[in-house]
From Swiss-Prot:
PTM notes: The 4Fe-4S cluster is very sensitive to air, degrading from 4Fe-4S via 3Fe-3S to 2Fe-2S then cluster loss. Upon cluster removal intramolecular disulfide bonds are formed. Can be nitrosylated by NO, leading to the formation of a tetrakis-cysteinyl [Fe4-(NO)8] complex.
The keyword Iron belongs to this UniProt entry's keyword annotation: yes
GO molecular function: 4 iron, 4 sulfur cluster binding; dinitrosyl-iron complex binding; DNA binding; metal ion binding; protein-disulfide reductase [NAD(P)H] activity
Record text on cofactor binding: Binds 1 [4Fe-4S] cluster per subunit. The cluster responds to both O(2) and NO. Following nitrosylation of the [4Fe-4S] cluster binds 1 [4Fe-8(NO)] cluster per subunit.
4Fe-4S Wbl-type domain mapped to chain residues: 36-92
Residue ranges the record marks as coiled coil: none
Name used for this protein in its record: Transcriptional regulator WhiB4
Amino acid sequence: MSGTRPAARRTNLTAAQNVVRSVDAEERIAWVSKALCRTTDPDELFVRGAAQRKAAVICRHCPVMQECAADALDNKVEFGVWGGMTERQRRALLKQHPEVVSWSDYLEKRKRRTGTAG
């Protein structure tokens, strides 16, 4: 071994990709600021097992529950309660619907179809 590290991998983002990323970040900041859990101790949301169901109660009346769920599903977040869903519930949805490209779109269509938020 030469003792040298390989060069860091560069990412070639186009201007359009940078704009999309900044728009996504701005949209995320906007909904996160409305989340009911924003002042909650994170330890209450990052629990294991049956305690997750109790933690999900915090989400029930949250105005951005759908955005939160979509963000967690799009980013395949493995831990914690997000958008009123436990880790197990998110894994099940991801497994049942591997074809979904945008969970935001999917959840919005489902909401319109069923007339519910979840």
